[in-house]
Amino acid sequence: MTPIPSFAEAVPVWARIGCLSFGGPAAQIALMQREIVDQRRWVSDKRFLHALNFCMLLPGPEAMQLAAYLGWLMHGVKGGVVAGLFFILPGAAVMLALSFIYAAFGNVPLIAALFFGLKCAVLILVVEALLRVARRALKGAVPWVLAGAAFLALFVFGLPFPVVVLAAALIGFAWPDAFAKGGHGGAGTEGNSALDAMLAADPGRIASMAPLARRAGLVALALWVWPVALLMPVGGVFADIAWFFSKMSVVTFGGAYAVLVYVAQEAVEHYRWLSASEMLAGLGLAETTPGPLILVLQFVGFLAGWREGGGAWGAVAGSALTLWVTFLPCFAWIFLGAPYVERLHDVARLKGALAAVTAAVVGVMANLALWFG
């Protein structure tokens, strides 16, 4: 059996995953499963799926949080931090460069034509994602009704996205049997992985890692809150960025496509940082870079800083601030929740809440496709 890798051996693997994680969460999760489970047998299929279900319950990009959680399982807090950062930073660097090109040359005919083609491709990707999620989530009459209700709530009544997500979660929590067939399923196989062998030899390992994980989670929360607290009394575009994307970090259930509805309601229609067409271009850029699709938020923060914060330096500051308040909470949720994951494995009501949110996301994505179109 392959032994658990050393931290130094794991780092290049996380870097490789971060640089190759194109194609959205489904492709990214498949890449991680191939690298970590199938090829190296560091983690068993069952534990991988268990970890994925936990990350699906959290706000934020599930693929990035899955990498951070698996890194924590193998090497503690430093493993989680490195795995999570490598999943974010390559794509963030590319997105920053592409954002500069868009802001500086987006009106040049050739560049404008390229971005128009990108927008058309993204519309197709949104529809494909809608159909894929619908096939997985809408199994039974109740999920279909909930998806339709979510669509009407947004398209007809204009309800805020967080209200729709919260209502769906409460319905699934109260009525888990109606959603038992939806969402991520499959128990997986235990297998003979390096991590399972290590945990069998040291049953108290996770419990011994818990105190440091909780401290790391609290530090991440503090680092997330302090710039918001400093900027809010000052006001201005950077205070708006800090506050808005901090709110986003606690309601980003259902993936990047679903979150774009909330971004559209606020960043486009309320703050007027960018247009719907530019939002579509930003999603296209996020689709073409490695890392989580939620990096589209970095593009929004970049344009807000570019237009209202003082040009290039304001754009860099807006981009960095957006990344800070978007991803620090992701690390906090992982480190605070990781020690308790095993207890969540068979909680039917939590699974019901997740499946109901996934069903509602179908309606949310249908609204998004019409809004972009």
Regions found by a protein language model. Give the residues of each.
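Multi-pass membrane proteins that catalyze or facilitate reactions on polyprenyl-/lipid-phosphate substrates
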Residues: 1-58, 69-289, 293-373
